[in-house]
Amino acid sequence: NFFEDPDSIVDLSTNIQYSPSDNGRWPGLRSNYLHRIYPRLFDFITTKITHLFYDTCKSWTYEITFQKVNPFSENQYDKKNCGWVHSDEYNFGGVIFLTKNPDDDTGVTIYKSKNGHHSINSQEEEIKNRHFLGGVVDDDIFNQFYNTYHNQFEETIKIKNIYNRLVLFNNDTLHSVQTYGTKERLTIPFFNTNISNKLPPLYR
């Protein structure tokens, strides 16, 4: 359990404004950065995460928001209601699950490349981004591109969505949301962009 009182954190998430991605890079809606709207909460989260790795650390920088994603389909397992495998361009990142009584298969899955390499082409990227922005994409076309892209990966670890659980991974870990479930999915995604210690956690 990450927060002592996660219900109070969920309450905070209801009193703020949310906006969609401007380019379809991620699904749903995100709040403004926590260091701007809830600086004490930001300090608590970043201090606790950073001290998982370092006893002392002079400074750090994170991008942290609340994120809400509503289902893209009435069918939980529709490809349009599933995440896209990706890695994050940061030192490390992760997510705190804040959905009470979440549906099964709404956590995070870790993958590896089947052949030691992978890529996303411009058509796959365009389909994904258009879908995340709420645009209309033909089901057959979407499924074709989704399946072709995801055939590059093999599942290695499946992590359940448990209320108040934190999941953390390094910048080259391939991962995706399993499904977006049948109701609103609330999380706190976080990304470390800078840390004062010379060595990252894996090398310490």
Question: Language-model features: where?
Answer:
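Catalytic core of non-heme Fe(II) oxygenases with the double-stranded beta-helix
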Residues: 74-204
